[in-house]
Curated annotation (Swiss-Prot):
Belongs to the DNA mismatch repair MutL/HexB family. InterPro entries: DNA_mismatch_repair_CS, DNA_mismatch_repair_MutL, DNA_mismatch_S5_2-like, HATPase_C_sf, MutL/Mlh/PMS, MutL/Mlh/Pms-like, MutL_C, MutL_C_dimsub. GO terms for molecular function: ATP binding; ATP hydrolysis activity; ATP-dependent DNA damage sensor activity; mismatched DNA binding. The gene is mutL. This protein is involved in the repair of mismatches in DNA. It is required for dam-dependent methyl-directed DNA mismatch repair. May act as a 'molecular matchmaker', a protein that promotes the formation of a stable complex between two or more DNA-binding proteins in an ATP-dependent manner without itself being part of a final effector complex. The keyword Transmembrane helix does not apply. This is DNA mismatch repair protein MutL. Keywords: DNA damage, DNA repair. NCBIfam families: mutl. SUPFAM superfamilies: ATPase domain of HSP90 chaperone/DNA topoisomerase II/histidine kinase (SSF55874), DNA mismatch repair protein MutL (SSF118116), Ribosomal protein S5 domain 2-like (SSF54211).
């Protein structure tokens, strides 16, 4: 007698729920996506006990036909695709027909729905089994209440995180859905406390304001670019505002929030050298593309996708972010915070929550980038990439690629700075028409040397000079074996190691632009970096080698400079492509405006 048998429907649904319904946030995601697919313009979410006791989602979509309601809770039952060809042109968020069946199998469900031309009804399910269906009075749309989640799978309930953690996961899920659909009005409550409210007017900036707050919204820069396959719209937050992890980079493909390591990495590369190590940006990128180029049928959660032209999209994102941020004048400005004042209940009704700037009085310090004054300049980049066509608000016209190559609109670079002196042999004090600037001399020269070394390392033909006395370098046996594997990488950096017996190598020539001070130390550092990297990634090695040499060969703090040296440093900095941060993302200049200085001295109140 055979031992293989077909599993009962309820057991199969419960097994499938292990993939589809991982936690309360999974239920929220599936229900809200169904509401969006139903054409809703308003979605309300109510939660109790972080969704474990109750998740209620109401929408004003087109609603269910009564005869479709029970069928919707069957496995692989859906209205969104009809045949296998539809899998290659998916335009809805859901399509697998698994979510409702999986959710119902591990919870109690109350469904209320009404179409505009039909009477309303309600259906009750327990553990995936329909208990009753009755007519009811309700508004057009659908309301689904999921209660007692995981009541029949105690092991899954046991391994849920704390309520705070589960609620944070739900909030993140809803934030991404709101960012993906700014045209929909979302309201989210947890035990009568409002967590999110958007106005549904289609303005993504307003959604970012609702989610991230006013400080972030004030630093948003927008850009758009286009290729034959992709249309990209980017909302980037200036590098002044950062976070400690990558989850604040939101990728939206055809209205679907996704996870994709390569695309996220392209965003980070666009911010490269503008952020401190260990800090990450806030950014929302929307991509419109042919559904044929994307495969969302990879995982039941549909967050992971495959792209057929991923490299092209990565390049478009990286170049758009790079060019957009390079056009900004990223000089932090010191501003005074207003003193805290108690507000009486009678005064609360008079508070103004508009985004208009208000005069400030204060004691503490806030870092803000000023709004750039724009002018055209020729863009030169050490990486010599060809920028994608960009358009920035308020202009609403697409720029063709050939136009970008001829003329790239850039914001004003460094202001005209007059050197006043040096502070603590580390900082250069400068005056300008709009205030006072303080420059970090080490960070400034680090940026200058980084771009110099990056350009020189990228040249296919390097000019060499013979050493009067060859440099002898001795390594361990382990290092010697590793060096043999990375000789092509070292050659890219202009280092030719000639075996000299045993674990010894000779260096007979070096590029003419190599720093002469501590030559052996420089070469050893580059060899060590190549050994650690192992893989032959020329671009990455070129980048890291440039940063290493720039950092170690730049003037340090506590190094006195005369007036001519300081002026030369400022002049050299003005010729760089990004004179606002060092290669590690630290600011080079800080500004005190004339107005802020006058406030400090009580000349203005």
């Amino acid at each position: 007698m055979g031992i293989i048998r077909e599993l009962p429907e309820q057991l199969a649904n419960r097994i499938a729920a292990g993939e589809v319904v991982e936690r309360p946030a999974s239920v929220v995601k599936e229900l809200v996506e169904n509401a969006i697919d139903a054409g809703a313009t308003k979605v309300d979410v109510d939660l109790q006990e972080a969704g474990i006791r109750l998740i209620k989602v109401r929408d004003n979509g087109h609603g269910f036909h009564e005869e479709d309601a029970a069928r919707a809770f069957l496995r692989h039952a859906t209205s969104k695709i009809r045949d296998e060809h539809d899998l290659f042109r998916i335009r809805t968020l859901g399509f697998r027909g698994e979510a409702l069946a999986s959710i119902a199998s591990v919870s109690h469900v109350l469904l209320k729905s009404k179409r505009a031309d039909e009477d309303g009804f309600e259906m009750t399910l327990e553990g995936g089994v329909v208990k009753e269906t009755n007519p009811t009075a309700t508004n057009v749309g659908t309301e689904i209440a999921v209660s007692q989640l995981f009541f029949n799978t105690p092991a899954r309930l046991k391994y849920l995180k704390t309520s705070a953690t589960e609620l944070a996961s739900i909030t993140d899920t809803l934030n991404r859905l709101a960012l993906s659909h700014p045209e929909i009005r979302f309201t989210v409550f947890h035990e009568e406390k409002e967590l999110l409210r958007t106005n549904g007017n289609g303005d993504l900036k307003q959604v970012m304001l609702a989610i991230y707050g006013r400080q972030v919204a004030a630093q948003i820069v927008t850009a758009s670019s286009k290729t034959s396959d992709y249309t990209l719209s980017a909302h980037l937050v200036r590098p002044e505002v950062t976070r400690s992890n990558k989850q604040y980079v939101t990728l939206i493909l055809n209205g679907r929030s996704i996870k994709n390591f390569a695309l996220t990495q392209s965003v980070l590369e666009g911010y490269h050298t503008l952020l401190p190590i260990g800090r990450y940006p806030i950014a929302v990128l929307e991509v419109k593309m042919d559904p044929m180029l994307i495969d969302v049928n990879v995982h039941p959660t549909k967050r992971e996708v495959r792209l057929s032209k991923e490299k092209e999209l990565c390049q478009l994102i990286r170049e758009t972010v790079q060019l957009t941020l390079r056009e900004q004048r990223l000089i932090p400005s010191v501003k005074q915070e207003p003193k805290l004042k108690r507000v009486t209940p009678s005064e609360q009704s008079k508070l103004d929550f508009s985004m208009e700037p208000q005069p400030k009085q204060a004691d503490s310090v806030e870092w803000n980038y000023p709004i750039p004054r724009e002018r055209k300049e020729t863009l030169t980049s050490p990486s010599q990439w060809n920028p994608a066509p960009l358009v920035h608000e308020p202009e609403a016209e697409m720029i063709e690629p050939e136009q970008v190559e001829e003329s790239v609109r850039q914001s004003e670079r460094l202001p005209a700075l007059d050197v006043i002196g040096q502070l603590h042999s580390s900082y250069i004090i400068c005056g300008a028409e709009d205030g006072m600037y303080v420059m970090d001399q080490h960070a400034a020269q680090e940026r200058i040397k980084y771009e110099l070394f990056y350009e020189q390392l990228g040249r296919p033909e390097k000019e060499y000079q013979l050493l009067l006395i060859p440099l002898t370098l001795e390594f361990t046996q382990e290092e010697t074996l590793a060096i043999e594997e990375v000789l092509p990488l070292l050659a890219e950096a202009g280092i030719t190691l000639e075996p000299f017996g045993g674990n010894t190598f000779l260096v007979r020539e070096i590029p003419t632009w190599y720093p002469q001070h501590d030559l052996e130390g420089t070469i050893r550092d580059l060899v060590e970096m190549a050994i650690q990297q192992r893989s032959i990634d020329i671009a990455k090695y070129r980048e890291e080698a440039s940063i290493l040499m720039a950092c170690k060969r730049s003037i340090k703090a506590n190094h006195p400079l005369n007036m001519e040296m300081m002026r030369q440093l400022i002049d050299d900095l003005s010729r760089t492509t990004s004179p606002f941060t060092c290669p590690h993302g630290r600011p080079i200049l800080v500004k005190w405006s004339t107005y802020e200085l006058e406030k400090l001295f009580k000349r203005v109140m």
